């Protein structure tokens, strides 16, 4: 990704009690934004941001949410994006589950995704193929660890147990195990959250990436 991420814009520092704008939802602190979303402070919240289609791994993620529900686990999924009916739509029944289940908080497409990262604990990004996924960079910059598939791009940003977890694409059981691990290891997730931002600021900051790209071009010229 030639652009990297703007770590000043994607920063949790913009979301504090002091930044709450009266009458404007999704501003302020994690607690305030969760309240806007009808999520409680105690909820463990996974987030997905992107096109809600099959090749983003959404059928597998839905299967995991159904399994949590069956086991009586009150795990929340914050879903940000659009359902697509033409290109690679979800399996029958999965869209309905995601739209109607009380453990799924569906907010549709959002031009500013930062408040939703603030409300979440872990990004789930079970995509089958990516270039260099902006959403994983953005999550990291916001201090959110990620569960990603072992594919190009994702596995360059996420290092196992440092700033997230990695599992094989299209493997719903493996995804479920990683999600369960996150829920059972909340203290580790807090450490990973801090490390997540550090990794992005260190390696994928916009200026850093531009500088590296420029140096590559200079080498080619010589």
PLM features: what roles do these ranges have?
Residues 145-148, 158:
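Short hydrophobic beta-strand element within catalytic cores of glycosyltransferases
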Residues 1-28:
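Donor nucleotide-sugar binding/catalytic pocket of nucleotide-sugar-dependent glycosyltransferases
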Residues 160-161, 165-172, 181-186:
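Conserved acidic donor-binding segment of nucleotide-sugar-dependent glycosyltransferases
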Residues 123-124, 139, 146:
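A short hydrophobic beta-strand element within the catalytic core of glycosyltransferases
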Residues 35, 174, 181, 188-203, ...:
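A short, well-ordered alpha-helix in the C-terminal region of glycosyltransferases
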Residues 67, 76-103, 188:
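Short, structured helix-loop element that forms part of the nucleotide-activated donor/catalytic region
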Residues 44-67, 165, 173:
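A conserved mid-protein helix/loop that constitutes part of the nucleotide-sugar donor-binding site
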Residues 109, 128:
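Aromatic "clamp/platform" in nucleotide-sugar-dependent glycosyltransferases that forms part
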């Amino acid at each position: 990704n030639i652009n990297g991420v703007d770590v000043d814009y994607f920063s949790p520092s913009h979301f504090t009690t002091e930044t709450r704008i009266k009458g404007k939802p999704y501003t302020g602190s994690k607690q305030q934004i969760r309240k806007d979303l009808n999520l409680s402070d105690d909820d463990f919240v996974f987030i997905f941001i992107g096109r809600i289609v099959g090749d983003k791994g959404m059928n597998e993620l839905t299967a995991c949410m159904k399994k949590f529900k069956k086991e009586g686990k009150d795990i929340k999924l914050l879903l940000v994006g659009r359902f697509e009916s033409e290109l690679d739509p979800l399996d029958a029944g999965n869209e309905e589950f995601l739209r109607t289940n009380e453990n799924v908080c569906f907010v549709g497409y959002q031009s500013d995704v930062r408040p939703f990262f603030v409300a979440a604990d872990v990004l789930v990004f079970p995509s089958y193929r990516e270039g260099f996924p902006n959403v994983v960079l953005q999550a990291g910059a916001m201090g959110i660890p990620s569960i990603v598939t072992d594919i190009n791009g994702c596995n360059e940003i996420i290092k196992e147990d440092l700033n997230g977890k990695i599992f094989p694409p299209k493997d719903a059981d493996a995804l479920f195990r990683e999600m369960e691990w996150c829920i059972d290891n909340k203290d580790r997730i807090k450490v990973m959250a801090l490390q997540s931002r550090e990794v992005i600021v260190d390696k994928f900051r916009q200026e850093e990436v531009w500088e590296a790209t420029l140096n590559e071009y200079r080498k080619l010229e010589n």
